[in-house]
């Protein structure tokens, strides 16, 4: 997945009309409000005129996922958590359409929130992305609040740093304790997959961890923008699978299957048959399917 090529001057920001970015108050007042979606309808929003030449959109070979031209009324609050330096803010910047440059004027110190409306499986959804996990000092209490306010979570680690992978496992346990009675969508994200020679955590380890902790798994590269689009599409699907009616999810699944190749359908069918009679194969099948973000 790549963003459309856009010529940008140093210190400029490319933004879609349906994405917004604002700075969060340092005292965390925004976290004390109720979580109803309508609370976002009165926020100040950045606007973009047709003359803006620094627009960006996610490139896709299909019509499954494009930036919506109209605001949807479905909001998903997604929280990025993980160790420092694993690429959370870079993922957030790509999501927001911000040109990632250390000299960019759009760099904001402190807690950030991004909003973007996507079209996923023919339906619009607005993601409110919170990237404030690394704020420490007097705001350490924000960690506890982050564990409570999300509709979904992206636990990010670097495949080049085993310590960050182990920390991700700890965060999954903490999140389970904080939200014991809730079925919260969680995706374990192995970032920096482009750094093959520096890899310390294998794909199989990431999958096994996701199976053990009952979450989804994907590897991304924020540097080359690989699988970032799929990541945010996937978290929308995971929330929908838990929240919406069975009939509505079945229609979405049918929508996806129409675009699925015959060989993949065959592998899925035979895999289910074999797994019924073999527990070890069932575990392997679950391990392989944990990266399928379109199913529970």
From Swiss-Prot:
Name of the molecule in the record: GTP-binding protein GEM
Positions of the UniProt region annotated as Calmodulin-binding: 266-285
Organism: Homo sapiens (Human)
InterPro entries: P-loop_NTPase (IPR027417), RGK (IPR017358), RGK_GTP-binding_reg (IPR051641), Small_GTP-bd (IPR005225), Small_GTPase (IPR001806)
Record-listed GTP binding positions: 82-89, 191-194
GO cellular component terms attached to this protein's record: cytoplasmic side of plasma membrane; midbody; mitotic spindle; nucleus; plasma membrane; spindle midzone
Domain of life: Eukaryota
Subunit structure: Interacts with calmodulin in a Ca(2+)-dependent manner. Binds ROCK1.
Record GO terms (molecular function): calcium channel regulator activity; calmodulin binding; GDP binding; GTP binding; GTPase activity; magnesium ion binding
Gene giving rise to this polypeptide: GEM
The keyword Membrane is annotated on this UniProt entry: yes
GO biological process, one term: mitotic cell cycle
Subcellular location: Cell membrane
Protein's membrane topology: Peripheral membrane protein
